[in-house]
Amino acid sequence: DKDMRHEAEIAVRLGRPIQIYPIMETALRHASGLSVDAHMEHISKLWAGFSDVAASNPNAWIREAKSAEEIRTISDSKRPVSFPYPKLMNSNNNVDQAAALILVSEEKAKALGIAKDKWIYPWAGTDAQDHYYFSNRDNFHSSPAIRLAGGKCLELTGSTPDNIDMIDVYSCFPVAVQIACRELG
């Protein structure tokens, strides 16, 4: 197992998500030319959309929809955690984001009684990784890995973002969602 932090990052104790993502968020805000207030309004609206979805999910950690204003407003119960993120823009420590995709042959799908109109066929898959060490990245507001992997997947499938009905992008922190959306077009 290789430590994901460079020795310089270890020396200054940099490496936890609550340290890295706020740095990226601030870099993205700067690269976007937004004021702190305008950026907070933007990311709290983004998070309010996720909150709306979570409110209808019986397995969600927080099942009460929060408005953008509630999300960005600091209070006794919604303390600042790591600028620019108040409590409701932070991940919860007991969240399981595990996912699985089980692929079977048509023969197996038939044997399992899965209706043919429920079958899906993967067209392509790609993988990429941004620089292993955070401090060695070219910048903190983009992801060449997402751009390259997403672009290659579109190329392999002959698709464009315009002819895709839905792309599900989620992360524990707003910046990762914003960067992914920008990189995927």
Identify the function of each model-found stretch.
Residues 1-95, 99-101, 107-108, 115-185:
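Conserved "HGTGT" condensation-loop signature of ketosynthase/thiolase-family condensing enzymes
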